[in-house]
Amino acid sequence: MAQWNQLQQLDTRYLEQLHQLYSDSFPMELRQFLAPWIESQDWAYAASKESHATLVFHNLLGEIDQQYSRFLQESNVLYQHNLRRIKQFLQSRYLEKPMEIARIVARCLWEESRLLQTAATAAQQGGQANHPTAAVVTEKQQMLEQHLQDVRKRVQDLEQKMKVVENLQDDFDFNYKTLKSQGDMQDLNGNNQSVTRQKMQQLEQMLTALDQMRRSIVSELAGLLSAMEYVQKTLTDEELADWKRRQQIACIGGPPNICLDRLENWITSLAESQLQTRQQIKKLEELQQKVSYKGDPIVQHRPMLEERIVDLFRNLMKSAFVVERQPCMPMHPDRPLVIKTGVQFTTKVRLLVKFPELNYQLKIKVCIDKDSGDVAALRGSRKFNILGTNTKVMNMEESNNGSLSAEFKHLTLREQRCGNGGRANCDASLIVTEELHLITFETEVYHQGLKIDLETHSLPVVVISNICQMPNAWASILWYNMLTNNPKNVNFFTKPPIGTWDQVAEVLSWQFSSTTKRGLSIEQLTTLAEKLLGPGVNYSGCQITWAKFCKENMAGKGFSFWVWLDNIIDLVKKYILALWNEGYIMGFISKERERAILSTKPPGTFLLRFSESSKEGGVTFTWVEKDISGKTQIQSVEPYTKQQLNNMSFAEIIMGYKIMDATNILVSPLVYLYPDIPKEEAFGKYCRPESQEHPEADPGSAAPYLKTKFICVTPTTCSNTIDLPMSPRTLDSLMQFGNNGEGAEPSAGGQFESLTFDMDLTSECATSPM
């Protein structure tokens, strides 16, 4: 079954997560219209190779045209309009950068796959997530639902008792007024009053019973409000707080957060019970106005009960107003909470009290740094204005599940310029990527005679003015959400807390697993720990400061740990994603470990790792060979950077890599990917067939051009090569190489520079693939 069809069959909570994957950058309508074709394309490869991305993008436009023709035949005007609008948008945004749309689609398909896996795992385990505390959480939720059922039952029981009290009071009131009128007549007639005294005793008994019933109801109401307080505290201080913490974790690459539907059902149920209870308390006031007496419990306790239920409902409504989707720029979906001035960002708020009567009644207003103006001025922080559509009415139509929400899709920030054209205080202690700002959402609720001011805010955001600030800004978001669940601490970086390696390691692994199919292994994390903390045996519990993580240069390097790692993450996502997902890239490995595992392998065995010295991110391969004396040698080629990988895929570099000896014979030193995977098996599928690169020439045309093929070649030194039986198939013939073919000394660490050659084929080969 197609992936899109499988997704349509998921539960509502998963469908809501699916809805959050899509935005204007890649509309869900397009995913729906072209589902089979979209799933048949290799978007990951397109995301790493511009020529293929261009081809796929133009094919996408062609598929849109075909689908438009179908809608035209069906006279489906609405779909025609939507599809035309989508095509115009895609052309305007991605025509010059097709790799961008390829990356977006590849990520969406990957997230869809993860969603299906999560749902399948939950189904196999009876609905429990694959987490050690899943059973405990489920038990807590079951207890919470039982408490909610108990509250609802007690409310209904009170409803019945209120009717009994009302009937009893009506009887008392009728008898009292009847007796009073009869008593007046008897006084006029001078009749015997013995009957009157007997009826008075009956009225006193009725009043006693009425008083007992009233006291019972008042007592039960007090107990019910206490039960509501307990349930509400569990909902807001535990369940909702847990959801908000999981949202923080999801924002920095952790496991996807569960949707809010179940929590919304619980909160709505409690709110309905509270409103019904408030009506019951109002009913007590009506009963009191009809019949009251000395020591009346309603007179004594009703005002307090009214105050308690109103406070409960107000607080519940305020807690139920949440930011469902944190601010995020659509072009950077994997890095929320970082906003660039002048660039649109989106966000979504939701009220977890699903009352139909509130549909289209709540107008949301957005502002930034509402309560921190004085603090911002004191710290010298920048100030911003929110532009775009900064007000919106909440409704139930925009969400798939009918939740009461408002999604802001067209917001931008503009900095308020000071008189000196810069920051308010040039002596500010924080750099701009450490400034934290809050986006606030406000509205007013008028419901059943109550006016409630609602306010919620985003997690702290970092505002940048240049995309080159993104790495440090994202580091700030990681550090903040890793170490605190305080949602409003905008002064966090005036004295940033210290993290432990265990915390940092988990977050670093998330940076890979959230955007690829593979996180970091223990061995890879250990290598990173060495980079941060130096050699050690056990890094668990070791402390890492904010400065060491992001601001201080690594030992012997001119850049920080985070700048180096972030560029590697970018390299993986844009250029070697497919190879990383396959597990072919060992990536982070110390040179000592590299030598240890390769030295026992046969010549031609190689591994792929990231450069430790390239600030911009580089990837290289290291192989084992034997020199003329039979001694094992470990060699590394000079790392390939993004600029080089933009011209040729890493898989094609590996498949075509050669060394050139002094006699100009080309030999491939790469045979087996560690531990023993044949090179062709691992990388062949990621290289485009040469028949596609060079379409056959027209037999009737003029003499065909010679085909060419780009390969990377490392020249070797010429010393001692005469004694070698130079054969491309004999790896034992490989010798110690240098940086050039003029007898230069080998480079330090055995690194080779590679040259890219454009090899002309003979005319005999011109019409046949190599």
Curated annotation (Swiss-Prot):
The modification N-acetylalanine is found at residue 2. It holds the Pfam family STAT_int. The modification Phosphothreonine is found at residue 714. Residues 580-670 form the SH2 domain. A motif (Essential for nuclear import) lies at residues 150-162. Signal transducer and transcription activator that mediates cellular responses to interleukins, KITLG/SCF, LEP and other growth factors. Once activated, recruits coactivators, such as NCOA1 or MED1, to the promoter region of the target gene. May mediate cellular responses to activated FGFR1, FGFR2, FGFR3 and FGFR4. Upon activation of IL6ST/gp130 signaling by interleukin-6 (IL6), binds to the IL6-responsive elements identified in the promoters of various acute-phase protein genes. Activated by IL31 through IL31RA. Forms a homodimer or a heterodimer with a related family member (at least STAT1). Component of a promoter-binding complex composed of STAT3, NFATC3 and NFATC4; complex formation is enhanced by calcineurin. Interacts with IL31RA, NCOA1, PELP1, SIPAR, SOCS7, STATIP1 and TMF1. Interacts with IL23R in presence of IL23. Interacts (via SH2 domain) with NLK. Interacts with ARL2BP; the interaction is enhanced by LIF and JAK1 expression. Interacts with KPNA4 and KPNA5; KPNA4 may be the primary mediator of nuclear import. Involved in the gp130-mediated signaling pathway. This is Signal transducer and activator of transcription 3. It comes from Rattus norvegicus.
